[in-house]
Amino acid sequence: MPRSLKKGPFIDLHLLKKVEKAVESGDKKPIKTWSRRSMIIPTMIGLTIAVHNGRQHVPVFVTEEMIGHKLGEFAPTRTYRGHAADKKAKKK
């Protein structure tokens, strides 16, 4: 179920402070965060946010189409390496 409109979007305060500071100074350095649950807001457009995927920080460049989505949607946590090949078929 989606979040109530009267509450507004959720964003961690520590991340919001970093975003506002980067916008003020015009800094283009990636903002490192572990907050995958934070929603992308319009002030983040044009910034690069390094989102943690459990192993490393994945750089995510925020565009206009991403507004309203969560940061974690753009940093996949699982890697799919394919199913094991059939060993009998390889020998022939």
Curated annotation (Swiss-Prot):
GO biological process: ribosomal small subunit assembly; translation
One GO molecular-function entry: rRNA binding
Key words of the record: Ribonucleoprotein, Ribosomal protein, RNA-binding, rRNA-binding
InterPro entries, per database record: Ribosomal_uS19, Ribosomal_uS19_bac-type, Ribosomal_uS19_CS, Ribosomal_uS19_SF
Record Pfam families: Ribosomal_S19
Gene Ontology cellular component list: cytoplasm; small ribosomal subunit
Keyword Cell inner membrane: no
Organism domain of life: Bacteria
Keyword rRNA-binding found: yes
NCBIfam families: rpsS_bact (TIGR01050)
Role played: Protein S19 forms a complex with S13 that binds strongly to the 16S ribosomal RNA.
Family: Belongs to the universal ribosomal protein uS19 family.
Protein name, per record: Small ribosomal subunit protein uS19
